[in-house]
């Protein structure tokens, strides 16, 4: 039987535990290829670089304990992921969503590249209790006042549908 491979793209979620994208991918493939791409289009400060270095070392060690290897790249994520897809037999690509405008635009392009290659692509909420576009008032519009928003979100915390499988 031929093994199925999937790429998990680590970004700001440099952890193996409680990682919904990684959990979902592990149920679909025989082997996960973990990657991290230092996006040269994004500038980060010295404190963030220090945190990133320590976190990548920790993640690298954690993956190594599971007989894996974290593949680290620097450059344009679109080009790097395209190159990996051309040179491998990957069936799935996954990551946890980021919500800043740059990441949304980049991720949309990458998802298009992946799916046009006939490869399944999944992104997951790995940061927030609720997706921003899912929290609306009774009128179907977004909340403008915090207290009603908080009351609505507080109720959602205790429903089984709101809890992600990876944290149950």
Q: How should each PLM-predicted stretch be described?
A:
Residues 1-156:
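Trp/Phe/Arg-rich N-terminal binding region typifying the photolyase-homology
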Residues 158-168:
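Single conserved hydrophobic/aromatic residue that forms the stacking wall/gate
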């Amino acid at each position: 039987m031929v093994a199925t491979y999937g790429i998990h793209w680590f970004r700001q979620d440099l952890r193996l535990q409680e990682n919904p994208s990684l959990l979902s991918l592990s149920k679909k493939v025989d082997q996960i290829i973990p990657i991290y791409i230092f996006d040269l289009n994004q500038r980060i400060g010295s404190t963030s670089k220090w945190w990133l270095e320590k976190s990548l070392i920790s993640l690298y060690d954690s993956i190594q304990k599971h007989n894996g290897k974290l593949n680290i790249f620097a450059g344009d994520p679109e080009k790097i992921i395209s190159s990996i897809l051309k040179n491998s037999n990957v069936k799935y690509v996954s990551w946890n969503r980021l919500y800043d405008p740059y990441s949304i635009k980049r991720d949309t392009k990458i998802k298009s590249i992946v799916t046009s290659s006939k490869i399944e692509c999944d992104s997951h909420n790995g940061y927030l209790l609720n997706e921003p576009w899912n929290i609306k008032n009774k009128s179907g519009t977004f909340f403008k006042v915090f207290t009603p928003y908080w009351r609505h979100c507080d109720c959602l915390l205790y429903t089984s549908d709101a809890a992600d499988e990876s944290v149950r």
